[in-house]
A protein has these predicted regions:
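C-terminal outer-membrane beta-barrel translocator/porin domains of Gram-negative envelope proteins
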Residues: 563-567, 579-734, 743-744, 751-754, ...
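Transmembrane beta-strands of outer-membrane beta-barrel pores
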Residues: 474-480, 491-493, 503-509, 520-522, ...
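Outer-membrane beta-barrel initiation region
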Residues: 387-389, 397-399, 405-406, 414-423, ...
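Hydrophobic alpha-helical and helix-loop surface patches within well-folded domains
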Residues: 92, 121-377, 427
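Beta-strand-rich binding/interaction modules
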Residues: 45-46, 342-343, 356-431
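Outer-membrane beta-barrel "beta-signal"
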Residues: 774-775, 807-819
Length: 819
């Protein structure tokens, strides 16, 4: 606030609000007559109209009949910079506004236009002119035209869009400052001139009355102009390139709905109607000031219909423009115009955290003697918010019938009886997905399904469809199964379910390898709790397992986030021809139960894992406790990473199987079996006779001493180890390439009970001090949206039980980061 602002006196008395990080000052309407005296080199814009002096626009007006680059060359060669001693005096008058803002810059260029009798000004930094020229002026004119059409006549003589140093946007009466040329941002900020500027709410107490309103009108504008995806495709040249040209377009409304639903189900939901500074954090503020009220207004438009909704909004605007508004004045205006009592709708949205979830309980149809069909539709409310529903009946010929079910108030169950002219085959409630119904799966008797290739880097998440993604895959192992081609199918729906089915058939051995796994989240219970399951017969290993995962944080959206998991896995059998090379001990069955806690605090990640064999399900008997911590800090192109692991295994004389002990080098068996190329030992590729690429592959984890990959160093039953890495990176944007040079050191103490003389496990722990150090190279790019990462490390220094040595030929590669 750059000037002393008059406190508003309204029906609640004096509003002497202090400054809060969320929400702006509540202002009183008045006239601002402001005179500026500044160096002439500065071009100025402000709320209001120029009544005296020259703001400098004419001297920097862009001739848009030229290509911008050509015009800038002419401008740079002809523009005469004012002398540093010259001054510019200019006066702006802003009438009937509750705030006044101004912006000045030596680098501004100007473009101007008109919408009816409204002057439209655009000022932008010369360095960003190629993106701003023409488009921002045209977008500004379209935005003010849209707002006048939908809400009412703009009451001021001008509107100005200016550039700003920081990204994002900020609104003032007659003036917005935007950090980018984005059309959606223009519409959003211009919407604020209506909702905040003209209809002046107290943003500290009721931020939703402006943020929610302009968010929803922006969404409707962008969908109206560009389609359901809600953005200008022409601005994204790569959308026409492979593979993006084959990606289905998303739905901007669905994205907003999913965002709200995730927050509503988090266990941290809060009422919309709350002072901005009372929300738990900025995330809760944004969802309750922007997302949720915008979706509330979309639902209101759905209930009233587009025409009545906008007519009612215009009534609200006409009645309260250039005055102070609040929740009651808005609700009263809508009810007054529509003639409907809507407290049941607004109270549930604004003053509770009740959720909407309707479902079809039953669908019965029967033919009548006159050729019509009777339908009995059982509707149930699993949630606690109530709303009328549009019911769509689909017939055999693909045509539909739409009608409203309005027996909704306070009903958890109802039967909707109606007749149709043709035989119905399916029914859907809320077919256009306009409500924030938590779970659409029960809204229809015939859920849509979309089959698509599993494009790398793409995620398609519609509210009203199952998404089935497919991807071919294969195993190839020349020493056993030969080629085993296969297919992976992923079945997904929002945050609630995911199922993966994979099958591979080996022609030579007639073996069928398969995987079935996935997860589920309850809709209404156990917030942020995921139930995982899996079973597979991969080459070398069979496994069955399950896990319950719970995420929790004291303040939603802010670290630390704690993840607590409990699970089990059983490996009943192994194929030694494949399993041994992955570090598995195939001599007996294995069953393990575990508890796991992980958290992140800023740049620090922590994990504690406790595991134990499962009685009769396991031929081994052991208990394991492992604590891992990692740190990653970076500044500009420099990065430092550190990992520390401490762990111990308690077991009997039989010891612990290789897949459950601590590997010195990493290369965890249970991690390696998830990678086809590691299961298949790089498909038999040999560097030279007797030496496979797999002998140089580093899968990070456990001891993580990369210098010991392929050295045959036995594992440990206890360890205290570290990995450190410092690196410097350089991005080559023209080549879409990142290169990173690293120096690393790994080391630790490792204990086991093996008596090397007798090769028998004893009772005394014997320690080994092991370490390595070296240099590395990391390469990162992407091809067709698939991220590609290659790590090459040269651990030339080795310290083992025989002492220290240098090995210039020691090298490892990996497709995973070391820490």
């Amino acid at each position: 606030q750059w000037y002393p602002k008059m406190v508003v006196y309204d029906e609640d008395g004096w509003n002497a609000d202090v400054f809060h990080a969320e929400g702006e000052f509540y202002g009183e309407f008045g006239n601002f007559d402001v005179k500026f005296d500044l160096p002439k080199a500065f071009i100025i814009a402000a709320s209001g109209v120029v009544t005296d002096g020259d703001p400098g626009w004419e001297s920097v007006t862009v001739d848009t009949s030229f290509d911008f680059d050509i015009w800038v060359d002419i401008y740079d060669s002809t523009y005469v910079k004012p002398d540093s001693s010259e001054r510019r005096t200019v006066t702006f008058l802003a009438e009937n506004v509750h705030d006044f803002a101004w912006v000045a810059s030596k680098d501004f260029l100007y473009e101007g236009g008109k919408h009816n009798d409204i002057d439209v000004h655009v000022l932008y930094d010369k360095g960003r002119g190629k993106k701003w020229t023409k488009d921002v002026l045209e977008g500004s004119i379209r935005a003010i035209s849209w707002l006048e059409e939908k809400f009412g006549k703009y009451p001021y003589p001008q509107v100005t869009t200016t550039d700003r140093i920081k990204s994002g946007g900020m609104e003032y009466p007659m003036l917005v400052m935007n950090g980018r040329e984005d059309e959606g941002l223009i519409v959003h900020e211009y919407g604020h001139i209506y909702f905040y500027g003209i209809l002046a709410n107290n943003e500290v107490d009721e931020a939703w009355l402006d943020e929610g309103f302009t968010t929803t009108q922006t969404t409707h504008y962008m969908i109206n102009r560009y389609g359901n995806h809600g953005f200008d495709l022409s601005l994204y040249e790569d959308r026409a390139e492979f593979p993006k040209k084959y990606w289905p377009l998303g739905n901007s409304l669905h994205s907003s709905q999913w965002s709200a639903i995730r927050f509503m189900r988090s266990g941290h939901d809060e009422n919309i109607s709350r002072a901005s500074y009372l929300y738990n954090n900025g995330y809760a503020y944004s969802r309750n000031a922007y997302t949720k009220p915008a979706l509330m207004l979309t639902e209101l438009k759905y209930i009233l219909g587009d025409s009545l909704y906008y007519d009612a909004m215009q009534h609200y605007y006409d009645k309260w423009k250039l005055k102070h508004v609040n929740e009651q004045r808005f609700v009263d205006a809508i009810e007054e115009f529509t003639g409907e009592e809507l407290n049941w709708f607004f109270d549930a949205w604004l003053h509770t955290t009740h959720h909407l979830d309707y479902g079809i309980k039953s669908f019965k149809k029967s033919p009548n003697s006159d050729g019509t069909w009777s339908v009995k539709l059982g509707i149930e409310s699993i949630g606690s918010r109530f709303i009328p529903l549009l019911v769509e009946t689909t017939f055999e010929d693909g045509t539909t019938d739409r009608r409203w079910w309005k027996n909704h108030l306070w009903r958890y169950e109802d039967t909707f009886n109606y007749s149709v002219d043709k035989k119905p085959v399916s029914v859907t409630i809320d077919p256009d997905v306009q409500t924030v119904d938590l779970d659409f799966r029960n809204n229809t008797t015939n859920m849509k399904k979309t089959l698509m290739f599993d494009w790398p880097g793409f995620w398609h998440n519609p509210r009203n469809e199952y998404v089935i993604r497919w991807m071919p895959n294969f195993y190839y192992h020349q020493e056993s199964s030969g080629l085993a081609p296969g297919l992976t199918l992923d079945f997904d729906y929002g945050p609630y379910e995911s199922t993966t089915v994979r099958a591979n058939y080996a022609y030579e051995t007639q073996d069928l390898y398969w995987y079935l796994g996935g997860w589920r989240q309850p809709v209404h219970f156990f917030p942020r709790t995921t139930f995982h399951y899996w079973a597979y017969n991969r080459p070398g290993v069979k496994e069955l397992g399950g896990e319950v995962e719970k995420q929790w944080d004291r303040v939603y959206g802010r670290t630390p986030t704690h993840t607590i998991s409990a699970g089990f896995y059983v490996q009943p059998a192994y194929d030694s021809t494949r399993a041994v090379n992955l570090g598995y001990d195939p001599n007996g069955k294995l069953g393990v139960g575990y508890l796991d806690w992980s958290s992140e605090i800023g740049s620090v990640d922590m994990n504690v894992n406790g595991a134990s064999s499962l009685g009769n399900l396991s031929d081994w008997n052991f208990t394991r406790l492992t604590v891992t911590g990692s740190l990653s800090v970076s500044k500009k192109m420099f990065r430092f990473k550190e990992r520390i692991i401490v762990g111990k295994i308690w077991t009997d004389a039989k010891g612990v199987p290789g897949q459950e002990g601590y590997n010195i080098e990493g290369n965890s068996s249970n991690d390696m079996v998830r990678k086809n190329y590691l299961v298949d030992q790089f498909y038999g590729f040999e560097l030279q006779e007797g030496e496979s690429l797999i002998n140089h592959y580093h899968m990070p984890g456990e001891g993580n001493l990369r210098g010991f990959v392929g050295k045959g160093e036995r594992g440990a039953e206890a360890l205290a180890a570290f990995s450190s890495e410092a690196s410097i990176s350089r991005s080559i944007k023209k080549l879409n390439f990142n290169i990173e040079f690293a120096a690393f050191a790994d080391g630790g103490l490792f204990w086991d009970r093996l008596d090397e003389t007798s090769n028998v496990i004893g009772s005394t722990f014997i320690s080994r001090t092991l370490a390595d150090a070296g240099l590395g190279l990391r390469l990162k790019t992407d091809i067709f949206e698939k991220d590609l990462y290659l790590r090459i490390d040269l651990p030339f220094f080795i310290h083992d039980i025989e002492g220290s040595s240098f090995d210039k030929e020691n090298w490892v590669i990996s497709f995973q980061r070391s820490i």
